Amino acid sequence: MLDQKLIRENPTSVEENLSLRGKVYNISHIHELTVKKKDIDIKISSLQSESKKLSKLIGQEISKSKNNDSPELISLKKKGNEYRIKISELEEKQRILDKEVDDEIYNLPNFPSKNAPIGKDENDNIQVKTWGNPLKDENLKSHWEIGESLNIFDSVKSTKISKSRFVTLIGNGARLERALINFMLDMHTKNGYLELMPPALVNSESLKGSGQLPKFSNESFKCSNDDLWLSPTAEVPLTAFHRNELIDPKQLPIKYVAYSPCFRREAGSYGKDTKGLIRLHQFNKVELYWFCDPTKSLEAHKKITSDAENIFKKLNLPYRIVDICTGDLGFSSSRTFDLEVWLPSSKCYREISSCSNCLDFQARRSSIRSKIDKKNIYLHTLNGSGLAIGRTMAAILENGQQTDGSVKIPDALVPYFGSNFLKNA
């Protein structure tokens, strides 16, 4: 959430910063609302101060007067009652204005970082690094073809169970999924992350705090009888884990890692990636999440990206890092590095992790602060996939495919999978 004070005092700067996203944001209405809200806040504070002074006068008058019905006391009490009525009326106006401001401000995205490349869409993203040697062979199979030949997942029967864009992992497919989850969790916990296993169902306030609501309500699955949603990413419950808290600065930085199932409608993706493991309604992911001192978030962003990179290197998967331009940034992000893995069958890199610095955007929405230099300030939050499991499996199947139809398991994963090769059972 953007700072209301900044919107109220410098609306032009706010519009200029938001315009870097490639859209026009007219905040004149919300600016007007924040000015009215501040005016009412001042009036309420002034009346409350006067009311306290009046209460003291009434107390003094009662103590020195034997007659509780004296004209002076009656006049003071009448004035006190007028104050209470006026304060109550203003507080009701304040409540209505608060809701109007929230309805507007919660739909405004984060400011893009000054270091993010200026651009309109994904075509303006900048490649900043590549690693590994991408396989380039016309005869290489897609991961869904490999999966079908090895009988490790089934999409057809999953459609019968649920609908399209679901998959059932079978035998060695389920085994490989478990191996990847445990491998990634072990890697990250050894690197100083504390593992959490959060709920898969989250309430609206949690989604609002991380930035999914209200803007992206059509992209998530909602329970019909409760204020609960299937979590689209562990970023949501990890943000909410410290909602409305004042965190001891001695605890910073807080680094969490969490495995969770993720659920997304994938609205707007009709016809894209209809086969395989790339774009599903349900998928597993290992998420990295930081809470840190605002002065340390730039370095933290480099570190969380490096921690995600480490998984690619250990699995020997060719990848690249892309600096996301201002027009392609996620709603809550100020700066994002996408980590994309090479998929030989597609002859391109595909996003498998987004490492984002959200500055104080999520912490402000979730009221997560720390007392630093004697001031209560909003912390900075960072998140990154470490990694998406299904897409990692797809990359292993394609990059590790052998001429005999088997798949070579990366050396670092062998202790978890229990075999050097994935073969048809």
UniProtKB/Swiss-Prot annotation:
Keywords: Aminoacyl-tRNA synthetase, ATP-binding, Cytoplasm, Ligase, Nucleotide-binding, Protein biosynthesis
Pathway membership: Aminoacyl-tRNA biosynthesis; selenocysteinyl-tRNA(Sec) biosynthesis; L-seryl-tRNA(Sec) from L-serine and tRNA(Sec): step 1/1
Gene Ontology terms, MF aspect: ATP binding; serine-tRNA ligase activity
Binding site for L-serine: T233, A234, E235, E287, S385
InterPro entries referenced in this protein's UniProt entry, alphabetically: aa-tRNA-synt_IIb (IPR002314), aa-tRNA-synth_II (IPR006195), aa-tRNA-synth_II/BPL/LPL (IPR045864), Ser-tRNA-ligase_type_1 (IPR002317), Ser-tRNA-synth_1_N (IPR015866), SerRS_1_N_sf (IPR042103), SerRS_core (IPR033729), tRNA-bd_arm (IPR010978)
Residues that, per the record, bind ATP: R264, R265, E266, E351, I352, S353, S354
Enzyme kind, highest EC tier: ligase
GO biological process: selenocysteine biosynthetic process; seryl-tRNA aminoacylation
Localization: Cytoplasm
Cross-referenced Gene3D superfamilies: Bira Bifunctional Protein, Domain 2 (3.30.930.10), Serine-tRNA synthetase, tRNA binding domain (1.10.287.40)
Top-level lineage group: Bacteria
Coiled-coil ranges from the UniProt annotation: none
Its EC number(s): 6.1.1.11
One term under GO cellular component: cytoplasm
Location, primary (coarse class): cytoplasm
Catalytic reactions of this protein: tRNA(Ser) + L-serine + ATP = L-seryl-tRNA(Ser) + AMP + diphosphate + H(+); tRNA(Sec) + L-serine + ATP = L-seryl-tRNA(Sec) + AMP + diphosphate + H(+)
Domain comment as written in the entry: Consists of two distinct domains, a catalytic core and a N-terminal extension that is involved in tRNA binding.
Assembly: Homodimer. The tRNA molecule binds across the dimer.
Family: Belongs to the class-II aminoacyl-tRNA synthetase family. Type-1 seryl-tRNA synthetase subfamily.
Annotated function: Catalyzes the attachment of serine to tRNA(Ser). Is also able to aminoacylate tRNA(Sec) with serine, to form the misacylated tRNA L-seryl-tRNA(Sec), which will be further converted into selenocysteinyl-tRNA(Sec).
Protein name according to UniProt: Serine--tRNA ligase
Organism (species): Prochlorococcus marinus (strain MIT 9215)
